[in-house]
Regions:
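Extracytoplasmic small-molecule ligand-binding "clamshell" domains
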Residues: 27-102, 110, 261-264
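Paired acidic/hydrophobic, glycine-rich loop segments that form the ligand-binding mouth/hinge
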Residues: 96-101, 183-188, 192-195, 203-205, ...
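Bilobed "Venus flytrap"/periplasmic-binding protein-like clamshell domains
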Residues: 40-48, 54-70, 102-103, 122-175, ...
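Bacterial N-terminal signal peptides
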Residues: 10-20
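Immediate post-signal peptide segment of exported/extracytoplasmic ligand-binding proteins
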Residues: 25-54, 132, 137-141, 281-293
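Ligand-binding clefts/hinges and TM-proximal coupling segments of bilobed small-molecule sensing domains
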Residues: 154-168, 204-209, 239-291
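Acidic, polar ligand-binding/catalytic clefts
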Residues: 66, 70, 75-138, 210-221, ...
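Extended ligand-binding regions for polar small-molecule ligands
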Residues: 62-71, 130, 137-138, 142-143, ...
Length: 293
């Protein structure tokens, strides 16, 4: 072997040594994935949360998860499914993560590893503009629609005289509202706001609950959190996703992402005054992320 070849080989070896320490596979990070180095994502199909286009994720949560996955060296694999079966799919290992306006609850935290919040929200009532309902009392003795599997359903069922219809998609619920088969809808705020903004001729309005009733915390509470949910075996990946999410909050890139999808209200970026995750699925000194710029 001549000197030139020896020098080329030495340079190649030096380059590989320089690169390899910073390159770790998902297996080396102890991620529990359906496929090695691939992040299988449950896609329930509602904008502006998380949908797949041309093999990549889009939507508010979609953009965040796409950025995080690329930073962690993971390839995205979208897996379409109904929302009603998505959490079970994560728990049984058929997909790795669920996102797209998934609300944190204490009950879900007992069975899933949940990331730091991608955003914040408050539920509301969708109705005809001339109704303009925004309180629990407005829903009494009315036909109301909501979504299968939503965390606040037990509270919604406690409203006096309320007749509840459940749907597997926001589109189906909105169609029934427009057709008069239900009088109001309590659904996914960003999805409904997005749909109404695209269809002003519907004559609908989505108004946040003004009750903030402590007896109905999941239904009317302020500053609730949207998160990504993973299996309990995937705490390492959940922690790494949280680090990537927090970086997007620190840089305020979350607001730039939100701007693309109509998430412009300060409520989308303002946590609850009550730090309800501290001591539950986070350390007691944990604080929810904010954009301070």
């Amino acid at each position: 072997m001549n000197n030139r070849h020896i020098l080329m080989l030495a340079s190649a070896l030096a380059l590989s040594v320089a690169i390899l320490p910073g390159m770790t596979s998902a297996a080396e990070k102890n991620y529990e994935l359906v496929e090695p180095d691939v992040l299988s994502v449950a896609i329930t199909g509602d904008m502006p949360g998380l949908v797949a286009r041309d093999g990549k994720l889009t939507g508010y949560d979609g953009d965040i998860l796409q950025i995080a996955a690329e930073k962690l060296g993971l390839t995205i694999k979208p897996v379409p499914m109904e929302w009603s079966g998505a959490i079970a799919a994560v728990q049984t290992g058929r997909v790795d993560v669920i996102g797209g306006n998934v609300a944190w609850t204490k009950q879900r935290a007992e069975t899933l590893s949940m990331s730091d919040p991608t955003g914040y929200f408050q539920n509301g009532i969708t109705s005809k503009k001339d109704a303009g309902w925004h309180t629990l009392k407005d829903l009494e003795n009315r036909k109301v629609g909501s979504m299968t599997g939503f965390s606040f359903l037990p509270e919604l069922r406690k409203v006096a005289g309320l007749e509840l219809s459940l749907y597997d998609s926001t589109d189906a619920a909105l169609r029934d509202l427009l057709a008069g088969r239900i009088e109001a809808l309590v659904g996914d705020p960003p999805v409904i706001d997005y749909a109404i903004s695209k269809n002003p001729d519907w004559g609908l309005v989505n108004l946040a609950f003004t009750d903030n009733n402590p007896d109905f915390p999941l239904l009317t509470g302020l500053g609730r959190q949207y998160v990504f949910g993973l299996s309990k075996e995937n705490t390492g990946l959940a922690a790494d996703l949280s680090n990537q999410i927090r970086a997007l909050w620190t840089s305020c890139e979350v607001r730039a992402i939100g701007q693309r999808y109509g998430n412009v209200s300060d409520a989308n970026y303002t946590p609850s005054a009550e730090n309800f995750r501290a001591g539950v699925d986070r350390p007691t000194d944990w604080l929810p992320p904010t954009c301070t710029k």
